[in-house]
Amino acid sequence: MGVFTFEDQTTSPVAPATLYKAVAKDADTIFPKALPDSFKSVEIVEGNGGPGTIKKISFVEDGETKFVLHKIESIDEANLGYSYSIVGGVALPETAEKITFDSKLSDGPNGGSLIKLSITYHSKGDAPPNEDELKAGKAKSDSLFKAVEAYLLANP
């Protein structure tokens, strides 16, 4: 199995504690409100909401209902850290065993947040991930984040 890690960093005008609460603790209710035409349901398949929990997130894309399996790896409220993996569904390419997202929030400019993100792609073989799949995944992730950010700014 190959392991490939990518680092990213961005800022948000939303305060770190507010943003963390929305994406790590209240995501099951915030995401459907931020994207009401896309998100259909969030269902716990296994676990109690803590590390090890697997959620099935159903959404509409191109007129079809699709899903992704999201596994919570770790929650670090004290340091505003959250880690999850995509372990199944349409967001997991056939060449990947899982894709892990580690995020850490801290104070950013003007009362906002600095978000550090590490994405680790665990491939089934030794081949690196497909560049087009990575770009498409990042674009979807960015648009989801911007929708949540806009929702939080409009609903303080």
Curated annotation (Swiss-Prot):
Belongs to the BetVI family. Keywords: Pathogenesis-related protein, Plant defense. The keyword Cell membrane does not apply. PANTHER family: OS08G0374000 PROTEIN-RELATED, STRESS-INDUCED PROTEIN SAM22. Induction: By fungal elicitor. One of its GO terms (biological process) is abscisic acid-activated signaling pathway. CDD domains: Bet_v1-like. One of its GO terms (molecular function) is protein phosphatase inhibitor activity. InterPro entries: Bet_v_I/MLP (IPR000916), Bet_v_I_allergen (IPR024949), Plant_def-hormone_signal (IPR050279), START-like_dom_sf (IPR023393). GO terms for cellular component: cytoplasm; nucleus. This is Pathogenesis-related protein 1.
